[in-house]
Amino acid sequence: MQHPREENSIVVELEPALATFIKQGFNNLVKWPLLNIGVVLYNTSTAVNEEWLTAVEHIPTMKIFYKHIHKILTREMGFLVYLKRSQSEHDNYITLYDFDYYIIDKDTNSVTMVDKPTELKETLLHVFQEYRLKSSQTIELIAFSSGTVINEDIVSKLTFLDVEVFNREYNNVKTIIDPDFVSRSPFIVISPMGKLTFFVEVYSWFDFKSCFKDIIDFLEGTLIANIHNHMIKVGDCDETVSSYNPESGMLFVNDLMTMNIVNFFGCNSRLESYHRFDMTKVDVELFIKALSDACKKILSASNRL
């Protein structure tokens, strides 16, 4: 019988500067939103609202919204979770399966329920205190992925809850909700001496390799776009930006992209430092080809899981 969750690693050997570039790109660009826009609608449990919202914020939602990875990473889509659960004599706990899960199309604000794997019944979130007929505990809450804009249009789509209660409770907490995009990286990634390693979790109910490909394709496309948009100032060196003086051959490195690209072509640079280097050695298209080849190598390694 296949275990529902397995920890694995995907390892590829790359040129060290390129491996570092991919690792840093992953950590800075591949951002999976947390459920930090949370609203408790009704709570008679022994856990206070803040405890519920903290627990829900960090639900591992990628294993639920796995069919929508690319559009969530590009922020074309968001998601929400909704829980309404009462204690009973024979049902005294809450699992992730008790939530309903919805995808949000940010263009139309449409809200669509997604299927949830039965394996979520194995993930415990809360245990109620001893059941008493006259004081049964109930919790109702909703939480949106970070970056979701809460407006009248999207609220009107929440037909499964009492909109008046939602508006009242949301107005009570919206000033303390972090307005910044709050996220986490889907995996831990390291690259010691060019050994690029992804520490991943594989679940039995969906095709991890397809999901991992969505992530790497997103990363590659975003990195290539960033390379094309990257600029190095030419002229007198300016310590506020990466800059190169062709007359002296001096390069000032002030960002990670410049550092990794010039290191790929033989420089031994560090951030916020000067280096004598011939920038004519840098071939951006050659670097992009090496990046694309590395991404193919990563996907090939993932297919061996």
From Swiss-Prot:
**Does the UniProt entry include the keyword Transcription regulation?**
no
Q: What is its EC number?
A: 2.7.7.6
Q: Which organism is it from?
A: Monkeypox virus
Q: Describe the subunit structure.
A: The DNA-dependent RNA polymerase used for intermediate and late genes expression consists of eight subunits 147 kDa, 133 kDa, 35 kDa, 30 kDa, 22 kDa, 19 kDa, 18 kDa and 7 kDa totalling more than 500 kDa in mass. The same holoenzyme, with the addition of the transcription-specificity factor RAP94, is used for early gene expression.
Chief subcellular site? virion
Where in the sequence is the signal peptide annotated?
A: none
Protein name as it appears in the record: DNA-directed RNA polymerase 35 kDa subunit
- Family according to the record: Belongs to the poxviridae DNA-directed RNA polymerase 35 kDa subunit family.
Task: State if Transcription is listed as a keyword.
Answer: yes
State one Pfam family annotation.
Pox_RNA_pol_35
Q: Where is this gene product found?
A: Virion
The UniProt keywords, alphabetically, are: DNA-directed RNA polymerase, Nucleotidyltransferase, Phosphoprotein, Transcription, Transferase, Virion
BP terms from Gene Ontology: viral transcription
